[in-house]
């Protein structure tokens, strides 16, 4: 009986190490290679621009991505604060270990990739040098009953694209016109400095925290996807057209397009309040989505080309 328990513990330890190593490599890969949908959208936008300057800027972005892969380095020097959105089944065997192993994976990736040191302890104001600290990496949880799968969304929240983020609660009389005004105000004021073209995540709910979380989850959706609600999907298109009309262009240098798209995520609200929030991803929108089964077999649907290299 004791031997069986020891074997089980060793098996668990090996599985934890394997998942840690996979996630460390996936974090590093996400830092270096942009998602397939982002690359495709940037190419589409480049082809639709009609001035030499805008085309040169887009070509520089593609050259940057080419060099990131060739030199095995991050596609942007600001590798952000690591954030994970975990949708985990209650029967996934490593659910109890996930938060700790994700932290260890970030530490490994910081050295191996390498990642810039971006975790500063607030009030004490020192950089930990490991990209981990109090509450970082951030892990948001969705628990899925009776499932043995685990989905992990990886996101690198850079400083520039984080700055436009904001949330507020509107009076119900302000309606969706108020939501539109709030979003456009943030984009006209701060979008220029967030390294456009941007992916804009809009969250609608009751309070600032529900709206803010919705807006972050919106950034995890594929470029070009639409809200399931027809009215919300229509608003996504209207906001996209409105922000494009500002004419930010690539890197804020002017052009026909300011955004790769607008994604809205919403939850039911209190009758007396409309919570709204904005989160923004820059042109180097580094998000990754990996799905594990109970045996740690995995699929990646955001990127082509990721392969786990098992250590000897």
Residue ranges: model-predicted function:
Residues 2-312:
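Non-transmembrane, aqueous-exposed alpha-helical and coiled segments at domain scale
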């Amino acid at each position: 009986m004791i031997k069986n328990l020891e074997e089980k513990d060793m098996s668990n330890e090996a599985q934890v190490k394997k998942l840690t190593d996979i996630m460390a490599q996936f974090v590093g890969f996400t830092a270096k290679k942009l998602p397939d949908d982002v690359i495709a959208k940037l190419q589409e936008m480049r082809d639709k621009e009609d001035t030499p300057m805008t085309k040169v800027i887009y070509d520089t972005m593609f050259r940057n991505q080419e060099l990131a892969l060739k030199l095995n380095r991050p596609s942007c020097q600001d590798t952000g604060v690591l954030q994970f959105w975990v949708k985990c089944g209650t029967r996934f065997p490593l659910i109890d270990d996930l938060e700790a192993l994700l932290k260890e994976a970030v530490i490994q990736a910081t050295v191996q990739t390498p990642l810039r040191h971006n975790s500063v302890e607030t009030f004490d104001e020192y950089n930990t040098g490991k990209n981990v600290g109090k509450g970082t990496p951030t892990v948001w949880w969705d628990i899925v009953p009776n499932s043995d799968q685990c989905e992990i969304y990886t996101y690198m929240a850079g400083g520039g694209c984080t700055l436009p983020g904001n949330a507020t609660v509107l009076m119900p009389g302000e309606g969706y016109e108020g939501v539109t005004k709030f979003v456009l105000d943030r984009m006209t004021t701060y979008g220029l400095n967030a390294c456009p073209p941007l992916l804009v995540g809009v969250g609608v709910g009751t309070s600032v925290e529900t709206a803010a979380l919705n807006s972050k989850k919106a950034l995890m959706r594929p470029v070009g996807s639409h809200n399931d609600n027809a009215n919300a999907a229509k608003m996504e298109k209207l906001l996209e057209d409105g922000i494009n009309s500002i004419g930010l262009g690539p890197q804020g240098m002017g052009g026909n397009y300011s955004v790769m798209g607008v994604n809205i995520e919403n939850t039911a609200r209190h009758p007396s309040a409309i919570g709204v929030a904005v989160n923004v991803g820059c042109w180097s929108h580094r998000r990754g989505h990996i799905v594990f089964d109970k045996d740690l077999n995995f699929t990646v649907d955001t990127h082509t080309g990721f392969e786990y290299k098992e250590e000897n």
